[in-house]
């Protein structure tokens, strides 16, 4: 990537907008692609994304664009902040334009039909692209408001990691690198499920002991599942694992937490999602994770319990009673780290 080339951000949501602004603050020309011409015009005229980051001033170096072809042709470094459900349909027609380019996924989700992570879908669509992911305890509004933040860029491509670090690293945003792309991305996707549970617990005033128990048992479940799929367990002790889990399960700014909180207040799932007005990836992830955990025979009682509440007609009190009556096992599973870097 040359200094003259603009950096592309695909997606007009809160996180894509925060990253676009951050890139601009670091001196890059940024082209942010979005589907909605009205949204693009609002950003162009008012320098604000009113739907997703209201009150945040968007820098003049960020150019909102609706012509995807032009954006892809002009950029070598492309951050992909598209909803998991839209990634294939948006990018599949543009394979030739993406070959050899650096594609960095910002989306924390899992494809329902295949249980593939976003970077795996990118690899499938564009085998000749250079693929990475960015994940960590990164609430979009806090990034935009310059709260001190750290994240992880993960790829087997060391040069890509260095490019992303150089592009994003700044006064309030620190970028670490990892070669465990699968583990980093899986951590970002799985924690969304547990944020829904945490939001419900807060709405029901369950107490600090309960919240602490939920977060630590969630980390155990996440790690157990991830290791069964080949991830490095040590990744889950870092920013993309426990770091992301803590912030997502503790902050009312988290979209998945907000859905859980609304459910705890008595709203239906449809009502909670409608109130949010954005995609909450944890709801979709829960469905596919429950099936996958059964398929690979990994014990995930919190996942099973939340699924029972949202999709099987069970009440929260029934699920809590079943969870507390289950036989307690070891606190921390022993996982050999032999063979991991």
From Swiss-Prot:
<comment type="pathway">
    <text>Membrane lipid metabolism; glycerophospholipid metabolism.</text>
</comment>
<dbReference type="GO" id="GO:0005829">
    <property type="term" value="C:cytosol"/>
</dbReference>
<dbReference type="GO" id="GO:0051287">
    <property type="term" value="F:NAD binding"/>
</dbReference>
<feature type="binding site">
    <location>
        <position position="255"/>
    </location>
    <ligand>
        <name>sn-glycerol 3-phosphate</name>
    </ligand>
</feature>
<feature type="binding site">
    <location>
        <position position="108"/>
    </location>
    <ligand>
        <name>NADPH</name>
    </ligand>
</feature>
<dbReference type="GO" id="GO:0005975">
    <property type="term" value="P:carbohydrate metabolic process"/>
</dbReference>
<feature type="binding site">
    <location>
        <position position="191"/>
    </location>
    <ligand>
        <name>sn-glycerol 3-phosphate</name>
    </ligand>
</feature>
<feature type="binding site">
    <location>
        <position position="281"/>
    </location>
    <ligand>
        <name>NADPH</name>
    </ligand>
</feature>
<feature type="binding site">
    <location>
        <position position="244"/>
    </location>
    <ligand>
        <name>sn-glycerol 3-phosphate</name>
    </ligand>
</feature>
<feature type="binding site">
    <location>
        <position position="15"/>
    </location>
    <ligand>
        <name>NADPH</name>
    </ligand>
</feature>
<feature type="binding site">
    <location>
        <position position="35"/>
    </location>
    <ligand>
        <name>NADPH</name>
    </ligand>
</feature>
<feature type="active site" description="Proton acceptor">
    <location>
        <position position="191"/>
    </location>
</feature>
<comment type="function">
    <text>Catalyzes the reduction of the glycolytic intermediate dihydroxyacetone phosphate (DHAP) to sn-glycerol 3-phosphate (G3P), the key precursor for phospholipid synthesis.</text>
</comment>
<feature type="binding site">
    <location>
        <position position="254"/>
    </location>
    <ligand>
        <name>sn-glycerol 3-phosphate</name>
    </ligand>
</feature>
<dbReference type="GO" id="GO:0047952">
    <property type="term" value="F:glycerol-3-phosphate dehydrogenase [NAD(P)+] activity"/>
</dbReference>
<dbReference type="InterPro" id="IPR013328">
    <property type="entry name" value="6PGD_dom2"/>
</dbReference>
<dbReference type="Pfam" id="PF01210">
    <property type="entry name" value="NAD_Gly3P_dh_N"/>
</dbReference>
<dbReference type="InterPro" id="IPR011128">
    <property type="entry name" value="G3P_DH_NAD-dep_N"/>
</dbReference>
<keyword id="KW-0963">Cytoplasm</keyword>
<feature type="binding site">
    <location>
        <position position="136"/>
    </location>
    <ligand>
        <name>sn-glycerol 3-phosphate</name>
    </ligand>
</feature>
<dbReference type="GO" id="GO:0046168">
    <property type="term" value="P:glycerol-3-phosphate catabolic process"/>
</dbReference>
<keyword id="KW-0547">Nucleotide-binding</keyword>
<feature type="binding site">
    <location>
        <position position="255"/>
    </location>
    <ligand>
        <name>NADPH</name>
    </ligand>
</feature>
<dbReference type="GO" id="GO:0046474">
    <property type="term" value="P:glycerophospholipid biosynthetic process"/>
</dbReference>
<keyword id="KW-1208">Phospholipid metabolism</keyword>
<dbReference type="InterPro" id="IPR008927">
    <property type="entry name" value="6-PGluconate_DH-like_C_sf"/>
</dbReference>
<keyword id="KW-0521">NADP</keyword>
<feature type="binding site">
    <location>
        <position position="108"/>
    </location>
    <ligand>
        <name>sn-glycerol 3-phosphate</name>
    </ligand>
</feature>
<keyword id="KW-0560">Oxidoreductase</keyword>
<dbReference type="Pfam" id="PF07479">
    <property type="entry name" value="NAD_Gly3P_dh_C"/>
</dbReference>
<dbReference type="InterPro" id="IPR006168">
    <property type="entry name" value="G3P_DH_NAD-dep"/>
</dbReference>
<keyword id="KW-0594">Phospholipid biosynthesis</keyword>
<keyword id="KW-0520">NAD</keyword>
<feature type="binding site">
    <location>
        <position position="140"/>
    </location>
    <ligand>
        <name>NADPH</name>
    </ligand>
</feature>
<dbReference type="GO" id="GO:0046167">
    <property type="term" value="P:glycerol-3-phosphate biosynthetic process"/>
</dbReference>
<dbReference type="InterPro" id="IPR006109">
    <property type="entry name" value="G3P_DH_NAD-dep_C"/>
</dbReference>
<feature type="binding site">
    <location>
        <position position="279"/>
    </location>
    <ligand>
        <name>NADPH</name>
    </ligand>
</feature>
<protein>
    <recommendedName>
        <fullName>Glycerol-3-phosphate dehydrogenase [NAD(P)+]</fullName>
        <ecNumber>1.1.1.94</ecNumber>
    </recommendedName>
</protein>
<keyword id="KW-0444">Lipid biosynthesis</keyword>
<comment type="similarity">
    <text>Belongs to the NAD-dependent glycerol-3-phosphate dehydrogenase family.</text>
</comment>
<keyword id="KW-0443">Lipid metabolism</keyword>
<dbReference type="InterPro" id="IPR036291">
    <property type="entry name" value="NAD(P)-bd_dom_sf"/>
</dbReference>
